[in-house]
Amino acid sequence: MTILHMDIETLRNYCINKKGVTEELPFGPDTLVFKVMGKIFALAGLDAIPLSVNLKCDPEKVISLREEYENNILPGYHMNKQHWNTVVLNGHLNPNFIFQLVDDSYNLVEAGLTKKQQQELKDLDE
């Protein structure tokens, strides 16, 4: 299946199917939050037009992504701008690239979990 445009359901399905992920609305009905083992890795503004998602990013890549994808990858809205980007889902970015950014965010957060949390996450497979 080829996806040409990212919508909230596609983004949600991709995020929620990752291991150990829960979804919540802790900041009100307009911000969908995805967590791995209780730690945020993605926030989607449901009232944003166009749809956007905040994703954690390697600090060494954060600026270069913003420069390369100007107007589509921005400093993280209401987030630590050294570690978070806002990715605008307006059809200008390849969905597979967006999925890779989601994966990168998930992996960064997973790597920052305590050893106990990492083991609990690993045990979810068994």
Language model features with spans:
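Charge-dense, helix-prone N-terminal extensions
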Residues: 1-126
